[in-house]
From Swiss-Prot:
The chain crosses the membrane at residues 6-26. F-type ATPases have 2 components, F(1) - the catalytic core - and F(0) - the membrane proton channel. F(1) has five subunits: alpha(3), beta(3), gamma(1), delta(1), epsilon(1). F(0) has three main subunits: a(1), b(2) and c(10-14). The alpha and beta chains form an alternating ring which encloses part of the gamma chain. F(1) is attached to F(0) by a central stalk formed by the gamma and epsilon chains, while a peripheral stalk is formed by the delta and b chains. GO terms for molecular function: proton-transporting ATP synthase activity, rotational mechanism; proton-transporting ATPase activity, rotational mechanism. The gene is atpF. Its main location: membrane. This is ATP synthase subunit b. It comes from the Bacteria. F(1)F(0) ATP synthase produces ATP from ADP in the presence of a proton or sodium gradient. F-type ATPases consist of two structural domains, F(1) containing the extramembraneous catalytic core and F(0) containing the membrane proton channel, linked together by a central stalk and a peripheral stalk. During catalysis, ATP synthesis in the catalytic domain of F(1) is coupled via a rotary mechanism of the central stalk subunits to proton translocation. Component of the F(0) channel, it forms part of the peripheral stalk, linking F(1) to F(0). Disulfide bonds: none annotated.
Amino acid sequence: MNITVGEIIGNFILIAGSFLLLVFLIKKFAWGNIIGILDQRAQKISDDIDGAEAARKKAEDLAQKREDALAGSRVEAVSIVETAKETAEKNKAGILANAAEEAGRLKAKANQEIAQNKAEAMSSIKGEVADLTVTLASKILSQELDKEAQSELIDRYIKQLGDA
């Protein structure tokens, strides 16, 4: 393999010329398309990054709004529970007061009825005792009785009262 310097230089010039011609042709016909494709790709990546950032920001805002709404709901729920407890306590006190008042009123009415019934019973008993006393006295006075006859008369009268 004897290659001369002339052949090496010739091959070098041919390869260099071919390379320069290839670079020229690529620049003339394909370079614009390649740069356009790369620019489009760079723009798409940039747009995707911007879209992802906007979506992340929107998600964060939505999460914050939901958290704020949840906190507001919790505060409102606590307020409603407290109001319900206060209302229940007020109602409880009112109901207990009404029940105590009603019980006192019923007790006073019952005591009044008992006293009235007692007075009526005493009046009735007094009348009956007076009638009995008068009847016994008239029977005793109408007859002159000895002890035995008097006892027998009283027993007979008591028996008549028991039958009536």
